[in-house]
Amino acid sequence: MNMVRGPGNLPVDLSSFVGRAEELAEGLRHLTEARIMTVTGPAGVGKTRTALRLAARLRRRFPGGTWRAELSGTADPVTTLAEALELPRTSSAREIGAALRERRPLVVLDTCEHIPGEVAALAEDLLAEAPRAAIVVTGRRPLGLPGERVLQLAPLPLTSAVRLFEDRAMAVDPRFALTPATAPIVAEICGRLDGLPLAIELAATLVRSMLARDLLEELRHRFTLLTGVSRTVLPRHRDLRAAVMWSYDLCDAEQRELWALLSALPGSFGLADARAACRGHLPGERVAPVLAKLVEGSVVLREPGERYRMLEAYRRVGLEPSGSPWRPAVQRPLRGGGRLPSPRQPGGTARPAGTLSARELQVAKLITEGLSNPEIAVRLDIAKRTVDAHVRNILAKGGLASRTQVAAWVAESDYQSST
């Protein structure tokens, strides 16, 4: 992105903006009704891009300028904002507000989750001293200020995700095109990446050196190849793991422990599942409040029907020992050596891993990835009723009550098939 002069300092986006029509409309409504709005969501979901797109659309409404202060690398948002506004570096928050008092500016305070208290204090002073100013904040959790509106960004729906992949792939390889052969592969790539724009953009850049089907096969096993090469983005946005680790580093010890424990649960889960996963590691009464903190910080997403879900990139970080390269989640114990209790035979002895056939082992591993029975049938090119039978056998052999427990069993075991 290049900077331009004018009424503000917004960067010019050199790539197309894909999707988010409903979110942009909601953001415009929020800023009609309120003076401060926070754009929240998980790592790589596009908070900065969406906030800057909104600000660009609002230039005419804010003749005092649309200004961005990028705060990820600072603990002093006041000085950073003063520099962005071309005011003296020694300006206080109230002095900045006073300088804006007779103007109607829109200020974007970008990436604030690491200094929420400082940014909240700055925002309060600006709103008090500059009654015509409005503020857009980006971060992985709201500031919690009176009158604050929240624009929650979810991963892209499949149609927009595929469009984004196609656009970014064609940018690096004009020969790339969606065809009847490649479209299903790209759709599966986008689904495996949970519709995260950052992950999709990083993956799309690889089509100049990899076929789409080879990229999909790599993503089935590891995410380490999702490292960007662009020097125009922040370091944490050049690597999917780095983006997620930014969130991990902001969590306290209790939140990190729950993050690791929940990583063994594939797909969606309920509070009861979370408590079961934490048995022996985290007191039962602490699970709900700590889980609420992870939801607030966009580590865990709320699903319909009082369910929760952790994106695959977050699961992989939670299952990876600190400092180790990513490996398939099912091959790794939980962080810190903690393990979920394995299913037991009536006598109390853990069932041997070798009770699964080779095909049942394949199905069990796909269950840990969150795939439904119809999806497993497509992946393995077998009938759904065959998958149903395999799942019943897995549950029976493991003494398991639900699919959620399959992940813990697979993650804990070394699993060599009995064939």
Which sequence ranges carry the predicted segments?
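Residue cluster at the C-terminal edge of the helix-turn-helix DNA-binding motif
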Residues: 61, 297, 396-401, 409, ...
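Intrinsically disordered or compositionally simple regulatory linkers and C-terminal tails
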Residues: 1-16, 339-354, 358-359, 415-419
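Helix-turn-helix DNA-binding elements, focusing on the entry/boundary residues of the two helices
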Residues: 271, 372-373, 391, 403
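Aliphatic-rich helical/repeat scaffold segments used for oligomerization and domain docking
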Residues: 1-340
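Helix-turn-helix DNA-binding segment
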Residues: 346-389, 397-398, 412-413, 418
